[in-house]
Swiss-Prot record:
A single GO molecular function term of this UniProt record: calcium ion binding
Keywords: Chloroplast, Plastid, Thylakoid, Transit peptide
Main location, first listed in the record: plastid
Protein name: PsbP domain-containing protein 5, chloroplastic
Biological role: Involved in strigolactone biosynthesis.
Similarity field: Belongs to the PsbP family.
Presence of keyword Cell membrane: no
GO terms under cellular component: chloroplast; chloroplast thylakoid lumen; chloroplast thylakoid membrane; extrinsic component of membrane; photosystem II oxygen evolving complex; plasma membrane; thylakoid; thylakoid lumen
Mutant phenotype after disruption: Smaller plants and frequent morphological defects, including increased lateral root branching, aerial rosettes and multiple rosettes. No effect on photosystem II and linear photosynthetic electron transfer.
Gene it is expressed from: PPD5
Intracellular or extracellular location(s): Plastid, Chloroplast thylakoid lumen
Organism: Arabidopsis thaliana
One biological process term in Gene Ontology: photosynthesis
InterPro entries: Mog1/PsbP_a/b/a-sand, PsbP_C
Ranges in coiled-coil conformation: none
Length: 297
């Protein structure tokens, strides 16, 4: 289940404007229809959890977890549903990973933009211990990933313990900016210091939301790329949007990204995917990341 918002207008600065959606759902037997009512919300830079940002509603999905509506008979479940947005149907697929106990929705078909997404599972869901590391110390690991090479889209899930930037043991005291810095400082395959890795990224917005009594931290950022003679200026960075939640001492993060020049078109769709991310109640298939974390088979 995902939250939708209309296309973003052209940016007039490094921050981008977005519209949030107020959602009411109606269920008739086995069929479901999500009715979307739009209301305008604009971004600002880093927002504090002490004062709610107007952007706080942009990425919030429905409070009920997807597991209420989806069968969990296998470690990975895929489902489809149609979501109406401004009279157009956006078909969403739903991915449920029982191994790591999370779910999210991803776009399949967007008629108003004449888009048919061509997703490939570049990394099928796997336990934390056998997942590919995103940093030299192997703390942060990518447990699943899907890509659309045609539209240059990537949606991935990573898991890793908090680093020293999160000094408090009480997660409800963490700010979204602190969580973003913790994740981004670990997110690199380069052998550089954490401060250098942070310099590669520019956080545009960060805020937190409480969903079912648990904090979810949302942040939007750019990752700069090294310029080359053949690269156009608009391709020198990727635009990311992420959501992080904590369970059992580990941070679970969904990352969705595209090229910076495509953000106006693809950003609203990726925001729906990130807004739908939820940690699910563990099933018998769940393998906690602290179980044999260095077992690679």
């Amino acid at each position: 289940m995902a939250l939708l918002c209309p296309s973003l207008p052209s940016p007039n600065s490094r921050l981008f404007r977005c519209r949030s959606s107020n959602i009411s759902s109606k269920y008739h037997g086995a069929s479901k229809e999500l009715m979307i009512a739009r209301s305008g919300v604009s971004t600002r830079s880093i927002s504090s959890e002490k004062g709610l940002s107007r952007r706080d509603l942009v990425l919030i999905g429905l409070s009920s977890p997807l597991s209420m509506f989806l069968p969990l008979s296998s470690p990975v479940t895929h489902a489809e549903e149609d979501v109406k947005m401004s009279g157009e149907e956006l078909k969403m697929g739903t991915m449920v990973d029982d191994i790591n106990a999370y779910s999210y929705a991803y776009p399949l078909d967007y008629p108003s933009e004449k888009l048919v997404f061509k997703w490939v599972e570049s990394r099928k869901p796997e336990r934390y211990s056998s997942a590919a590391p995103l940093s030299p110390d192997a703390r942060l690991r990518i447990v699943s990933e899907r890509v659309d090479l045609t539209d240059n889209l990537v949606i991935s899930i990573s898991i890793g313990p908090p680093n020293s930037r999160l000094t408090s043991k009480e997660k409800k005291t963490w700010s979204a900016k602190e969580v973003a810095d913790s994740v981004l400082s670990d997110k690199s395959a380069l052998r550089v210091t954490s401060s250098q890795r942070l310099e590669e990224s520019s956080v545009l917005d960060a805020h937190a939301s409480d969903i079912d009594g648990e904090p979810y931290w949302y942040y939007e950022y750019l990752v700069r790329k090294s310029p080359t003679k053949i690269a156009e200026a608009s391709k020198l960075y990727r635009h990311y949007i992420s959501s992080t939640a904590e369970r059992d001492g580990y941070l679970y993060t969904i990352n969705a990204s595209t090229l910076g020049k495509q953000w106006d078109k693809m950003g609203p769709v990726l925001e729906r995917a990130v807004g739908s991310f939820r940690l699910l109640p563990p099933t018998d298939s769940y393998v906690p990341p602290y179980k044999d974390p260095w077992r690679f088979w």
